[in-house]
Amino acid sequence: KEYRRQRQMCIRDSGEPTLYTRLSEYIELCHSHGMTTMLVTNGTLPKVLEKLDTLPTQLYVSVDAPNKEVFDEICRPKWNAAAWEKFDETIDLLPSLDTRIVCRHTLIKGRNMKPEHIPQYAALDNRADPDWIECKGYVHVGNSRENLTAENMPFHEDILDFSNALAPLTDRKLLDDSPPSRVALVGREIVPIPIPEATMYFPEDLGIAESVKHLKIIQ
């Protein structure tokens, strides 16, 4: 029942989504069910983005490094020696894509959010010309715990300081922020997301058994 009411599909986990060969078809299918789509990519496959027949409702590009040196240190590309160069291509491609664009900066204290990095991020953001810039704090979970520590998590005040310094360099302003999530939104204005018109519908009976919260203990 909850799945039939789904209105937003986030395409981001289980690896880089632009490696999926039927991505455009999947996005189109989501839109046909009246869902918005949010595609999160590391930007290292610009040709895939350029050739998508159907673009997502909103495209998030991870801009986690201000330059190649920091990129190689933090993102640590293993299979693509030219990852930074491909990412750089994506930055210049973004203004030509007819969809909502967000540049997301995941900020790691002591690594990629030093004062000298801010103008470099601004230069990338100005080239990409996104609708919004999202500045969010790194969270010490998952595999990142092998390389980083809890001390690398910035406070919300750090995120706000970074965002307020970045905003005027991109001719934007701080629009909103969330202290619990340690995230700030930089842009010119907040515009409601367009909802695709549904042309396909899920059947009333999906053939899925009702969930069981408590099972009897078998002695």
What does each model-found stretch correspond to?
Residues D53-L59, R127-D131:
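Glycine-enriched alpha-helix->loop->beta-strand junction motifs that scaffold or abut catalytic
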